[in-house]
From Swiss-Prot:
Species classification: Bacteria, Bacillati, Bacillota, Bacilli, Lactobacillales
Organism: Lactococcus lactis subsp. cremoris (strain MG1363)
Gene disruption phenotype: Disruption of the gene in peptide-rich medium and exponentially growing cells significantly increases expression of over 30 genes. Repression of oppD by regulatory BCAAs is completely removed in codY mutant.
GO cellular component: cytoplasm; protein-DNA complex
Cytoplasm in keyword set: yes
Keyword annotations of the record: Cytoplasm, DNA-binding, Repressor, Transcription, Transcription regulation
Description of activity control: Activity of CodY is modulated by interaction with the branched-chain amino acids (BCAAs) leucine, isoleucine and valine, which are signals of the nutritional status of the cell. Whereas both BCAA and GTP are CodY effectors in B.subtilis, L.lactis CodY responds to the intracellular BCAA concentrations, but not to physiological fluctuations in intracellular GTP.
Protein purpose: DNA-binding global transcriptional regulator which is involved in the adaptive response to starvation and acts by directly or indirectly controlling the expression of numerous genes in response to nutrient availability. During rapid exponential growth, CodY is highly active and represses genes whose products allow adaptation to nutrient depletion. Targets include genes involved in amino acid transport and metabolism, but also several genes belonging to other functional categories. Among others, they include major components of the L.lactis proteolytic system such as intracellular peptidases (PepO1, PepN and PepC), the dipeptide transport system (dpp), the oligopeptide transport system (Opp) and the ilv-ald operon for BCAA biosynthesis. Binds to a 15-bp cis-sequence, the CodY-box. Multiple copies of the CodY-box are present in the intergenic regions of some transcriptional units.
Subcellular location as annotated: Cytoplasm
InterPro entries: CodY (IPR014154), GAF-like_dom_sf (IPR029016), GTP_trans_reg_CodY_C (IPR013198), Transc_reg_CodY_N (IPR010312), WH-like_DNA-bd_sf (IPR036388), WH_DNA-bd_sf (IPR036390)
UniProt superkingdom: Bacteria
Protein name (Swiss-Prot/TrEMBL): Global transcriptional regulator CodY
Length: 262
């Protein structure tokens, strides 16, 4: 059996290995799996909205409530509201308590089931909650030492995610601004008319119809779309006689156009 020191080293190694994949739908699955293996439990990481960021289930609990959570990738709102009010680690919550991951009706199936919740902080902000549970056997003091270390590691990783998301939002906003600024008045007018024809963020348009509708030439529309596509703001595909398929890749375009007067 691994010693506390060995387990501690396995957790701190996560920071060195860079186990998150921000391109994945659940970017922290690998990290959560490693933590669950070290602490010897089922585990998941949620953000402050209750959205699932990663999970690992080495022990199958046959729990409908938990299964539904992973299917929806979000915990019930009332559970999340209670969880974010926890400011220190809450250990070994029994099955019959509201914050137990086990449904109350499963008390007879998992009489010794316990849940431990630990808040995740980063850069002075609450970023989420680390939830762990076992069917049989409480979390010991040694386990809780590992939990405290794990939440620190998760906090660093979530801070990195938040920073990358901020940088990505700034990049998209800058690209949308630059793309719109390259358009002439007529081209901006054309793009706004095109956006109004789309069904949300994508759809198909017929350039000649829009040109006639707003009183410009078809070439103005073609030039405007070419500029936006080269800036990575939209993508387009010819549909032949049916017109052109368009998809807005950078939704910042909507705000930039809305701020212009025509």
């Amino acid at each position: 059996m691994a010693t506390l020191l060995e387990k501690t080293r396995k957790i701190t190694a996560i920071l060195q290995d860079g186990v998150t994949d921000l391109q994945q739908e659940l970017p922290y699955n690998s990290m959560t799996e490693r933590l669950a293996n070290v602490i010897d439990c089922n585990a998941c990481v949620i953000n402050t909205k209750g959205e699932l960021l990663g999970y690992s289930l080495p022990y199958n609990t046959n729990n409908d409530r938990v299964d539904q959570f992973f299917y929806d990738r979000k915990l019930p709102d009332e559970y999340v509201r209670a969880a974010v009010r926890i400011y220190d680690t809450m250990a070994n919550v029994p099955v019959d308590r509201p914050l137990a991951i086990f449904p109350e009706e499963s008390l007879s199936d998992f009489p010794k089931g316990v849940t431990t919740l630990a808040p995740i902080y980063g850069s002075g902000m609450r970023l989420g909650t680390f939830i762990m549970w076992r069917e049989d056997g409480e979390f010991t003091d040694d386990d809780l030492v590992l939990v405290e270390l794990a939440t620190t590691v998760i906090g660093v990783q979530l801070s990195n995610l938040k920073l990358e998301q901020m940088e990505e939002n700034i990049r998209k906003d800058t690209m949308a601004t630059m793309a719109v600024n390259t358009l002439s008045y007529s081209e901006m007018k054309a793009v706004k008319a095109i956006i109004e024809e789309l069904d949300g963020e994508e759809g198909h348009v017929i350039a000649s119809v829009i040109a006639d509708k707003i009183g410009i030439t078809r070439s103005v529309i073609v030039n405007a779309l070419r500029k936006l596509e080269s800036a990575g703001v939209i993508e387009s595909r010819s549909l032949g006689m049916k017109g052109t398929y368009l998809k807005v890749l950078n939704t910042g375009l909507f705000d930039k156009l809305a701020g212009r007067n025509f």
